From Swiss-Prot:
The chain crosses the membrane at residues 33-53, 77-98, 113-133, 178-198, 226-246, 288-308, 320-340, 347-367. GO terms for cellular component: mitochondrial inner membrane; respiratory chain complex III. Signal peptide: none annotated. This is Cytochrome b. It is found in: Mitochondrion inner membrane. Its cofactor is heme b. The cytochrome bc1 complex contains 11 subunits: 3 respiratory subunits (MT-CYB, CYC1 and UQCRFS1), 2 core proteins (UQCRC1 and UQCRC2) and 6 low-molecular weight proteins (UQCRH/QCR6, UQCRB/QCR7, UQCRQ/QCR8, UQCR10/QCR9, UQCR11/QCR10 and a cleavage product of UQCRFS1). This cytochrome bc1 complex then forms a dimer. A ubiquinone binds at H201. The keyword Electron transport applies. Disulfide bonds: none annotated. Heme b b562 binds at H83, H182. It comes from Suricata suricatta (Meerkat). It is a multi-pass membrane protein.
Amino acid sequence: MTNTRKSHPLIKIINESFIDLPTPSNISAWWNFGSLLGVCLILQILTGLFLAMHYTSDTATAFSSVTHICRDVNYGWIIRYAHANGASLFFICLFMHVGRGMYYGSHAFLETWNIGIVLLFTVMATAFMGYVLPWGQMSFWGATVITNLLSAIPYIGTDLVEWIWGGFSVDKATLTRFFAFHFILPFIISALAAVHLLFLHETGSNNPSGVSSDSDKIPFHPYFTIKDILGLLIALTTLMMLVLFSPDLLGDPDNYTPANPLNTPPHIKPEWYFLFAYAILRSIPNKLGGVLALVLSIMILAIVPLLHTSKQRSMMFRPLSQCLFWLLVADLLTLTWIGGQPVEHPFITIGQLASILYFSIILILMPIFGTIENQLLKW
């Protein structure tokens, strides 16, 4: 008789995805982040669900309801901070996951890569709307500034912004719809993640060497379930350290002041995980140009596979491209730092140089270095 997990219509799908899945034997810890992202998503949905039970999406009571969660709800503070800092863990895993894909040439799986980009945009949209919900100063002004960017779109811009706001400014209608979207999007993300996995399992996983591993595969369970659990324990320990010891480390003090449309904070800035894109936006003096650069800073990932000129898929044996990759990482860290600084000299210049370098590395230098490495292989 066949094992139930191999014959049952529903359990069979789980079995083929997480138990008997043939996996390259040499994948490193960089392949842990996919499962970590799944755990982050489940954690965010669960904590978010419990927060939604006590939250009110009304401008008059939103701030008070978040305070009520922290003060009066049993373990409300831990749920709230696990949710807020869980978003940071989510983005750390996302950036690592995308970086891994670029480094080891996983972008050759076009469908998986493109669904991944859609996922990245969706998660960013969800996080942005979630940041608006506590209705503090930075929530309100962040929402105002970022939604206002759409007014740069020619002809329809102003109408589009007012349509999103549901009025002539960020107000009750905006908060209510942002809550509705913030609630529904994680489920859409879950569906997209399932499609992401579906496409990945059509081709099988990539591996650090970048060559086919069909001749050397092992079952996912128990080998990689154990390996993923180690990564999970490290991630959850880090998250709980953050939540229990310094929950406000990554937040903005301005968000502990209730939203006031008559008082603008001195430095409006988003959460840390958007700062690199925010720095690119600010480095262009023109409004429409800045918005385009902001979108392109993420959309550029879509043309990474088209710019792959090297005969080798992975960067494992390409030292020149490795140097370039780590320069890109350093550049993104610089942009993140600049995004949190005030708009004044020398930060403006540093931001502009870092933005130029960001696009230059991906669009110009990486393809050139790939070609040079091809020539070096002939010698």
